[in-house]
């Protein structure tokens, strides 16, 4: 392979690395849990990480139980699971 071809390959690999989302193995395991509204009656807005869409989404939380994939703010969700 010529040096020009190697440089092109190196550039493409670098671009791929920058544009590829963070690997799921770098996230806490609870980020992969489905959102869980819980059994109570207090409907409040919360956020959860959706691993299919690689983003944090809003859901209605009942105020008790549920699971750890439950954040009060979208920023907290992003800091924990989306980075």
Curated annotation (Swiss-Prot):
CDD domains: Kunitz_textilinin-like (cd22594). Belongs to the venom Kunitz-type family. It is found in: Secreted. One of its GO terms (molecular function) is serine-type endopeptidase inhibitor activity. PANTHER family: BPTI_KUNITZ INHIBITOR DOMAIN-CONTAINING PROTEIN (PTHR10083:SF383), KUNITZ-TYPE PROTEASE INHIBITOR-RELATED (PTHR10083). It comes from Austrelaps superbus (Lowland copperhead snake). Its main location: secreted. Residues 1-24 form the signal peptide. Serine protease inhibitor. The record marks 41-42 as: Reactive bond for trypsin. Disulfide bonds join 31-81, 40-64, 56-77. This is Kunitz-type serine protease inhibitor superbin-4. Residues 31-81 form the BPTI/Kunitz inhibitor domain. One of its GO terms (cellular component) is extracellular space. Expressed by the venom gland. Keywords: Disulfide bond, Protease inhibitor, Secreted, Serine protease inhibitor, Signal. The keyword Secreted applies. SUPFAM superfamilies: BPTI-like. The lineage of its organism: Eukaryota, Metazoa, Chordata, Craniata, Vertebrata. Transmembrane segments: none annotated.
């Amino acid at each position: 392979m010529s040096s020009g071809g190697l440089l092109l390959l190196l550039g493409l690999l670098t671009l791929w690395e920058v544009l590829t989302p963070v690997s799921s193995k770098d996230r806490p395991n609870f980020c992969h849990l489905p959102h869980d509204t819980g059994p109570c009656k207090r409907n409040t807005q919360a956020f959860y990480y959706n691993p299919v869409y690689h983003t944090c989404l809003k859901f209605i939380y009942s105020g008790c139980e549920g699971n750890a994939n439950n954040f009060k703010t979208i920023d907290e969700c992003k800091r924990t699971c989306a980075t």
